[in-house]
Structures are given as structure tokens and as C-alpha cells.
């Protein structure tokens, strides 16, 4: 059955991919599958397979899904389509069936499979834009940057070096500032800013 597929858009390096691993810890019986969409070709989703019928009748072809999708395991998976918006058109078209219909090459994914996509924000100038026909298949959700307090608390629990935590306490407001809050990139050298490269 159809499901809603979220497209998580956030600043570079703020943990979008990590969410798949965190979901894997929460659902330990699920396979975690991270698709590096920007580096995929159409053959990475499905390939033609020739069927030779046992009765000797004419052979025919079908498409077989790539094993990385785990369809053959008949188990639930967590599928992250990472860097989805940078993918090749043919790959994205194939993955739209995964996103909307929960199937690939005519084979249904496990009904409990969790699917989401991640991308950078379109304002970062990295080519991340949702095409008109994709807007019907994805629900964009903007991920906010972490606050310095959240990062310091996390770092303290993980045993980060006190000097690093001190630097974050001093410069954290600049480190974790969203680029669209900065009118001139020269005012804050820490986050990526599209103006700095253009």
C-alpha cells in the first residue's frame, strides 16, 4: 500500500544520515539500508533477467531488484535514500516507485519497511531541488540545526575532551548558526554559506 515518504532536508553535516542508524537501534530486527543515490546508476536498482521456461516455450525477460533492497529477505527494512535530490533522473524515477508504491521491479517491499529520503537544503546551491512530479511523492520536512546546548550535552555524555566542549560553549552560537540567518558570510566563518563559494 502507499505510504508517506518524508524528504528530510537540512544543512550539511547535521546528522541526516545518522537518523537511519538511530532508527536501526530502535528497531533492531530491521535491516538498515543506506542508498548513496548520488553515486547510483539505474542498474543499481534493478536489472533485466531472462527467464527460460522449463516447458521449452519462448524465453522472456523480467526485471529483478538489486539485493541491497532486501526484498528477497522478506524482512522489514529501514531504507534511507541519501542525497536523493542529487541522483540521476533515471535512478530517481526508479526510486519514486520505492517511495510511493513500496515496490521495486514489480516486487513489494515488506509492509513494515520504513522509507525516507535525505537531502541538503535547496538554498545551499548544491543542486538539491525537488522536481514537480517528485512533489507528489515526497513530503519535505526541514531539519533544524542543533543548538550549542544540545551538542555540548551530547558531547559531555560521550566523553568529549573538555577543551572541545569549552570551544563549543564559547563559539557555539556561531558554529551552529543556520546559513540563512547570516546576511553576509564574512560575519561568520564557521557554517557553510552559498555566498562563500559563488
Q: PLM ranges: what are they?
A:
Residues 1-32, 36-79, 84-198:
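C-terminal regulatory/interaction module of P-loop NTP-utilizing enzymes
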Amino acid at each position: 500500500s502507499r505510504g508517506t515518504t518524508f524528504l528530510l532536508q537540512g544543512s550539511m553535516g547535521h546528522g541526516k544520515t545518522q537518523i537511519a542508524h538511530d532508527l536501526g537501534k530502535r528497531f533492531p530486527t530491521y535491516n538498515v539500508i543506506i542508498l548513496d543515490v548520488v553515486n547510483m546508476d539505474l542498474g543499481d536498482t534493478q536489472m533485466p533477467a531472462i527467464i527460460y521456461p522449463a516447458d521449452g516455450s519462448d524465453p522472456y525477460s523480467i526485471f529483478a531488484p538489486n539485493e541491497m533492497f532486501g526484498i528477497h529477505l522478506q524482512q522489514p527494512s529501514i531504507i534511507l535514500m541519501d542525497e536523493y535530490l542529487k541522483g540521476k533522473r533515471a535512478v530517481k524515477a526508479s526510486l519514486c516507485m520505492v517511495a510511493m508504491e513500496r515496490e521495486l521491479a514489480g516486487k513489494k517491499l515488506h509492509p513494515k519497511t520504513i522509507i525516507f529520503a535525505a537531502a541538503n537544503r535547496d538554498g545551499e546551491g548544491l543542486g538539491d531541488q525537488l522536481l514537480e512530479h517528485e512533489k507528489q511523492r515526497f513530503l519535505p520536512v526541514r531539519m533544524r540545526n542543533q543548538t550549542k546546548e544540545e551538542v555540548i550535552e551530547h558531547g559531555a555524555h560521550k566523553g568529549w575532551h573538555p577543551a572541545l566542549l569549552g570551544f563549543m560553549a564559547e563559539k557555539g552560537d556561531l558554529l551552529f548558526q543556520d546559513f540563512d540567518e547570516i546576511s553576509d558570510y564574512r560575519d561568520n566563518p564557521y557554517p557553510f554559506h552559498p555566498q562563500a563559494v559563488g
